[in-house]
Amino acid sequence: MIIRQLSAITLAIILLTTATATAGDYGRYYDKLPIKMAEPDAPQIPDNTVSIADFGAVGDGITLNTEAFAEAIRAIGKLGGGHIVIPAGIWLTGPIVLKDRIDLHLERNALILFSPDKKDHLKDGKVQSCISASKRSDISITGEGIIDGNGEWWRAVKRGKVSDTEWKDFQRMGGTEADGGKLWYPFGLKNYDDIAPDFKAQEKMRVHMIRLTDCERVLVKGVTIQNSPKFHLIPTRCKHVIIDGVTVRCPWNAQNGDGIDISCCQDVLIVNNTVDVGDDGICMKAGGGAAALKYPPVARILIRDNTVFHAHGGFVIGSEFSAGVEDVAVLSNTFSGTDTGLRFKSAPGRGGKTARIYISDIYMSDIRDQAIVFETSYVDVPVGTAGKASEAQDFLPEFTDIHISNVVARDTRIGIAAKGTTQMIHGISISDCAFFCTEKIAELSGIEAFGEGSIKLENVKLL
């Protein structure tokens, strides 16, 4: 194995990035919280360092470097773990599978670009996420570079959400139009083969950008994550996760372009991030229905000092959360240009119960719909379908023990909206808030009025 002699400055930056995460500097975010939680344990990465270029990788945007990434991961693994440095350049690759005690470090002007050829994401007939890890510990993705999922080669497009020029650009790629020209699918493209027999089957094979499953001690810091085929960053059943200073972005109309989705995780810090995406911004999920009961709830999550621009919701719980969501603090965040600000959505068959959710010091502007919305009959509408209301009689959503204070929302169409019964929406307190509404101050359905039994308002200005 050849190990390139990295510059002292590069090595110092890498070590500083991971050392600051292990030195307990996140403790200041946990002072005087409304609920008890401790800062997550950061990953422990050995000091070994290699460059991806040492393994034959070429950053020319043309050479496919999948095997070079795999070889670098194997090599650093034999050393007990360490840092894999991605220098400046465009590094085209297929899926990257991380192992224990590895830091993937992107230097400034480094761009990891995932292959637009869907066949490069296939293994044993199944598609792989762009970056993944399963049942691993001490994983980090750090630096100042960009990770790009090439999502436009995967996502369906709705004609009503793009300009004439953009629509013609998609048509020039080839593809398949459906629903009377209202939809375009990247099936039958001019330059790349399909991986499914029809466009509907291929649509279901879209991959996530970064999917970490059953992992412990995870750090994602500083990088830009953009243009995912589906969700961007989705830790699932992970413990001790830190997401710090990350930019997550994709076109506003990207189908299912969720930003940060926390699914059945515990002890998570989400801090100093910027999100600008096509679906939910920062979202808590906990599985839907009976299958979710074998998993732990989302628990002990701190979300603070983040900015969300376009998203369907700035902070979201749902739609599936049957395992429960508890002990969450959402503090000092800004939402500018989101469809909704605080969004609580679910439906029978996928609901669960919330507990000890504290939200305060939230600043919103230019909110397209509601500043705060509770919805218990949410209908998921996959692209190309009409959607269908749930007929389930079990796993009813119960949004309760939610406390919202010190929210200022300017230019929101509706201040507070709730759709559901007092059995599903109760124990909600909203205090010391001001909502400047452009259409109506409130919209209630099923709940007759604000009050002790459902949503209690105290010192709230609705203008």
Question: Each predicted region: which residue ranges?
Answer:
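Short, T/G/N/S-enriched strand-turn elements that build extracellular solenoid repeat scaffolds
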Residues: 73-77, 92-101, 222, 231-237, ...
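Right-handed parallel beta-helix
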Residues: 108-109, 137-145, 216-226, 239-251, ...
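Extracellular beta-rich repeat passengers
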Residues: 321, 332, 341-463
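Extracellular "leader-to-stem" segments immediately downstream of a signal peptide or signal-anchor
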Residues: 4-11, 16-85, 90-103, 107-214, ...
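Short glycine/acidic-rich loop motifs that flank beta-strands on beta-rich extracellular proteins
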Residues: 81, 95, 115-117, 150-154, ...
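Active-site-proximal loop/turn and secondary-structure-junction residues that shape catalytic pockets
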Residues: 90, 237, 247, 286-288, ...
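Short, small-residue-enriched loops and turns at beta-alpha junctions
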Residues: 58-60, 289-293, 323-324, 350
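Conserved short loop/turn motifs at secondary-structure junctions
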Residues: 86-93, 259-261, 347-348
